Amino acid sequence: MSTHLEHDDKKDAAHDYTQQVTPADAVPSSDVEDVEVKSGLKRNLKSRHMAMISLGGVIGTGLFLGTGSALANGGPLGLFLGYATMGSICYCVMICLGEMISFLPIPGGHIKLAERFVDPALAFTMGWNYWYNWVIILPAELSAAAVLINLWNDTINNALWISICLVVVVAINFLGFFGECEFWFASIKILTIVGLIILGIVITAGGGPDHRSIGFQYWRNPGPFVQYDGISGVLGRFLGYWAVLTQAAFSYIGTEIVAIAAGEAKNPRRNLPRAIKRVYIRILIFYLGGTFIIGLLVPSNDEGLALNSGNALASPFVIAIRRAGIPVLPSIINACLLTSAWSAASSDLYTSSRALYGLSITRQAPKIFSRTTRRGLPWISISFCALFAALSYMSLQSTAGEVFGYFSNLTAAAGLMTWWGICFIYIRFEKGLRTQGIARSSLPYSSRLNYRASAAWYGIIMITIILFFSAWSVFLKDNWSTSTFVTNYLPLWLFPILWISYKYIKKTHFVRASEMDFVSGLEAIEAECHDEAPPSTILGKFWALLM
């Protein structure tokens, strides 16, 4: 990703901004603005924590396991193009979010931004949609962790493994260790994917025990694309690519978690732009590099890709390793996948509790959820969200597990609706800046690629198309599935229904561009910001480069 596409203004953003707009020029927001900047949350998350929180939220089973079925559906080139297309959308969402949240790093993240720059009704809709998304993924990740353990021991009831994982996840969040634990969890995941990419290159070049050079062999036979569902010609290849695109969309969901953590970030005006700018670049490198190597290592017609084991045996990396005759690595990779699921569950509880906290401080959830401990932990929100982890035990019973699966599947579309909302908020945000004569270059972070909200419009258009055609496969001959149709399209209709219903009941109005408040709360945010001395040692400089 070229560095000329974005720049990080090194000047003090608040100084530049106040030269253009004074408090007298701005229309103050609602009286809850004081809650934003005087919230009970504490800014305890360092730069390295912020970088790893966003990375940890997206690098996981989608890359390690989900790419297997994507390869089977689209072929090696279809796999790469699908993830590249979705990566471009992820990039646009992140630069939109980065400009806004770096300027206003407030508790509630994009939920509060929706209230401030669009409409309280959108904040209500996005907040509850986001809370549901992560509070339901939480038990799904706990169930996945138990299945991963089954690779080593399938004689013990999964309820025990779920309980152990749940206790650890709740303890991490209640004791305030989330940032530090997520840093180490995410580090393991990054080392794993980097190691797998390097190993994949070695195997492809013939460096495995069998010394067989693969090269682009599988791009020639069975070919770069898969004819989806046996449909011949260009249409079959395009449908294979589109199947990958919808799967890739769900793998990238989670990059926006950094916005929810912004209200707890130390020195946010400095650390958030750095974290956001570096995170999406690394995600694209890991995903695009990983999918390209996978397309070289495993043929798209390999029978192992059809496995539904839920553990490392279904990973295309493991399939390639076993093909190369390396016996020990599958268990090691499974251990890394287990830490990935554990990390994701911890992140899910953190994100859902902060989303609920954000709803509470905007008076769109009971006030009790905004209570915090002296250490700044929203303990009631954490406790309430942790209760939903008990849904993971539903997966132990076939009927209940099927019902739970339906709820889990709803989260994929809900995540894309969040991205759609972020892009829409940015369009209004950018409109407000232009109307009030505020230069985007005065913001702590801005991207030249997002001129006149072009990146936001690209994101909205692409996400809308993906959402409308997410369940297209059910319309193929003899392929109808009511559950697939409902779980893909229900969130698409619930989102506007919630928005319109809240707007009608509460009589809310769109915030006019000329009345948007770009001032309230800045003084407290500026007080949290300070210059940091650059590292002087070689090790320190290397660490700063990584983070």
Q: What is each of the regions a protein language model found here?
A:
Residues 1-68, 72-77, 90-91, 95, ...:
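Membrane-interface "cap" regions at the ends of multi-pass membrane proteins
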Residues 40, 156, 187-328:
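Helix-loop-helix junctions that connect adjacent transmembrane segments
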Residues 42, 52, 63-160:
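Extracellular loop-to-transmembrane helix junctions
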Residues 106, 129-143, 247, 252-265, ...:
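Membrane-helix boundary/coupling elements in multi-pass transport proteins
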Residues 111-116, 142-162, 259-269, 274-281, ...:
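Helix-loop-helix connectors at the membrane interface of multi-pass transporters/channels
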Residues 112-114, 119, 225-231, 244, ...:
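TM-loop-TM module centered on a large, flexible mid-protein loop between adjacent transmembrane helices
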Residues 160-220, 253, 276-280, 408-421, ...:
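Membrane-interface loop-to-helix entry segments
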Residues 184-185, 214, 371-377, 419-488, ...:
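C-terminal membrane-solvent junction of multi-pass transporters and transport-like membrane proteins
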